Amino acid sequence: MSNIEDYPFPTGLHLLTQWQSGDEAARKEMTAFFDDAIAGCFDADFSVLAPPDRVHSTASVHMLGLTILHDLYNIESWAYYNTDPYRYVRTNLAVSRLLGIHKFYTTWALYAFTCEPLGQQMMYPDRFPP
């Protein structure tokens, strides 16, 4: 099992960089890390509140999460956003941790979730957000 504490900033960022460059060992490590994240092994860590004496900032990481899951598991866009909320949230929180973000936020493709119930048809490409 992976230990999320093994990926403090910038270690997690270095792993992401190696994976993006096509390093096969990094891909295997990423797969093990995300297997554990998706299984809920890091949920206790995700529940720890960020220190209140700091200013926290983050970015929308859902697109990087989609890219990772498409590469590692061949999960396509529609399935990523629509089928498993636990996988979606855990993936985003794990990506945040690898990027060195201390306060966890969950972001999503709000435009897709608001336009579809109103009758609009969304286009879900295989590995890009709607």
Give a label for each model feature.
Residues 1-130:
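Catalytic cores of TIM-barrel enzymes
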